Amino acid sequence: MLEKTIYYKMITLKVKNIIKEKLPLKSGDKIIVGVSGGADSIALLHILTELNLDLQLIAIYIDHGLRPDEIPQEISFVKGQAGAVGAEFESISVDVLALKNCDKLSTEDAARRLRYQAFAEARERYGAKYIMVAHNADDQVEEFFIRLLRGSGRRGLSGMPYQNGLLLRPLLSLTKADLLLYLQERGIDHCEDSSNREPCYLRNRIRLDLLPRLEEYNPSLRRTILNTSSILESEEDFLEKSARELFNRSTRINREGKLPKTELDCRSFSGGHQALQRRVIELICWQMDAQPSFTHIENICRLATEGTSAKTLQLGSGLRVKKEISQVVFHYPLGRIATRQGEREIRLERRIDGEGIFAIPELNRQLTISTGEGAGEGRLLVDREKINFPLLLRFHRAGEKFHPLGAPGRKKVSRFLTDKKVHGEDKQLYPVLINGDGNIIAIVGLAIAAQFKKTETSKQLISIGWQETTT
């Protein structure tokens, strides 16, 4: 092995300082290290070892199934490098093309998803504390342009952080040239990934075509971009903290049910700057497992700040945003399901053979059929002798009518629901319960049909309950 040079010492010292200042590593920590065999990851593996931090390293190689002619040699090489530094080694195969075709993703996106999923599973399997990858300053510049072309805002253009949860990136301050020189001085070999030269990948086109062209206008472009990302990162931190403060002042999260409900106070929210308002709405949606588009965020902001009321917006996965006087409520009235046009249609046809408690996951509700008067809000009582099992719980049909108890005659179910201030897709929350003879017994949770009412001569009653699922 060659004599340690001054440049080698500079590189290792730089990484050591980054770890000390920005990363939470401690002696004895077990770390998953992503090692592809390329210069960056091989340098990372050796630098971590030579820093003598007493880390337990597990080198993980991901076979994406895209370069079958090169993979065996790479696996053998990485295994040898891991053994040379005393690290454990595992090769994991993933099927990128299957995910790409199934979810209509680009090859790059599918590979990234599967790669990080494999790292996360390996971390659990080995009981490791963190995952470490070899992203460097050149990757940071390329990522800036990838995100810029995709329309990212300040947060995205701030670049990749040194730490993102359990993911650590200790090489972000080093360039590709730094790492290649490190390997050269240490006499360490590395693999060349042939796919890095293929123009079909966006990152490659940026690295091989766009950046060289832009550097004709600004030879210091890469340093300029890194400086810009650093400025944006600092400003992003300030904005994020300010948005959190507005979020804490203006929202209340109710976790009593199976799915969370968030209430946004319009007055407190309206006092915030528009930039912070957008972030608060995005934060609410993410916390409720929804991915809002720019249009969603803008519409919700208008709903909260303008003087409109009783308006409802639909987001994907069943999330509903409703204006209620002085607040906006985010909730899942039908459960976490697709409700928008073009997504999976909700269907409901449930046979009820007798008494019991019946989960209706389609609506995040449960139906209870029991003998006696029962107890609980929203229970309806009907004459047992008039009930013919099996019953059927389903959505009402267009034009379907029944005779509500207390009404002078028959009425369309849809019109009855409208009269009860139940509108739009909220009507699905109140399906009809059909008797064995085909007649409507009740709109569950709201009303029974007059012909099934209890009378003085009723010998036994059936109680019909309809509650939101809370367990």
Swiss-Prot record:
Disulfide bonds: none annotated. Its EC number is 6.3.4.19. Keywords: ATP-binding, Cytoplasm, Ligase, Nucleotide-binding, tRNA processing. Its main location: cytoplasm. GO terms for cellular component: cytoplasm. InterPro entries: Lysidine-tRNA-synth_C, Rossmann-like_a/b/a_fold, TilS/TtcA_N, tRNA_Ile_lys_synt, tRNA_Ile_lys_synt_N, tRNA_Ile_lys_synt_subst-bd. One of its GO terms (molecular function) is tRNA(Ile)-lysidine synthase activity. GO terms for biological process: tRNA modification. It comes from the Bacteria. Ligates lysine onto the cytidine present at position 34 of the AUA codon-specific tRNA(Ile) that contains the anticodon CAU, in an ATP-dependent manner. Cytidine is converted to lysidine, thus changing the amino acid specificity of the tRNA from methionine to isoleucine. HAMAP family: tRNA_Ile_lys_synt. This is tRNA(Ile)-lysidine synthase. The gene is tilS.
